[in-house]
Amino acid sequence: MKRQLTVAVAGAAILAAGISGCSGGNKSGTSASSSANSSGTTRRLAPGAAGTKVTIDGKDQNVSGSVVCTNAGGTINIAIGGAATGIAAVLSDGNPPQVKSVGLGNVNGVTLGYTSGTGQGNATASKDGNSYKISGTATGVDMANPMQPVNKPFEINVTCNS
């Protein structure tokens, strides 16, 4: 149990670190851009892009910054917001997409995330055009009570620019 929870939290931390790698480039955050490279396709939306909503434990989250969607090698990487407060998800490129991992960042002192195969939490995804709905239960550790895992329901609705 402790090992699986540690793996889940480590996965969330890795995802959070990955967001910082995706957040470079458009520092002003005021213009939308689209680019492609040899490893896949990257799509960016301007801050406050329509269609983005994140809910954790029934509460809307204030997530600001760009939406970056990258499709490479059969995997969709979605990053919302900046490195410090961002949300990230990794999905398969199938229909329906399978959730590989989700990083929700720090919510009220608890770093929340989901990683498939750990036995901790759950997540499903659906796709409608360029819009994704990712929902489930993320897990984390409250450092005030590290022996008691924290589970929070979440839902992410995001649209990737075509």
UniProtKB/Swiss-Prot annotation:
* Keyword Hydrolase applies: no
Pfam families in the cross-refs: Myco_19_kDa
- Where does the source fall among the domains of life? Bacteria
Q: Name one GO cellular component term.
A: plasma membrane
Q: How does it sit in the membrane?
A: Lipid-anchor
Q: Where is the lipid attached (S-diacylglycerol cysteine)?
A: C22
The places in or outside the cell where this protein is found are: Cell membrane
Maturation and modification: Modified by Lgt on Cys-22 with an S-linked diacylglycerol with a mixture of C16, C18 and C19 fatty acids, signal peptide is removed by LspA, modifed by Lnt with an amide-linked mixture of C16 and C19 fatty acids.
**Region Disordered: what ranges?**
24-53
| Lipid-carrying residues in chain (N-palmitoyl cysteine) | C22
On whether Iron-sulfur is a keyword of this UniProt record, the answer is no
Locations of Low complexity compositional bias? 28-42
Renumbered to this chain, the signal peptide range is 1-21
- Alphabetical UniProt keywords: Cell membrane, Lipoprotein, Membrane, Palmitate, Signal, Transport, Virulence
Per the record, the domain comment is:
Forms a U-shaped beta-half-barrel with a large hydrophobic cavity.
The Swiss-Prot or TrEMBL record describes its family as follows: Belongs to the mycobacterial 19 kDa antigen family.
What's this chain's function? Might be involved in ligand transport. A host TLR2 agonist, modifies host gene expression in response to pathogen.
Q: What is this protein called?
A: Lipoprotein LpqH
Q: Which organism is it from?
A: Mycobacterium intracellulare
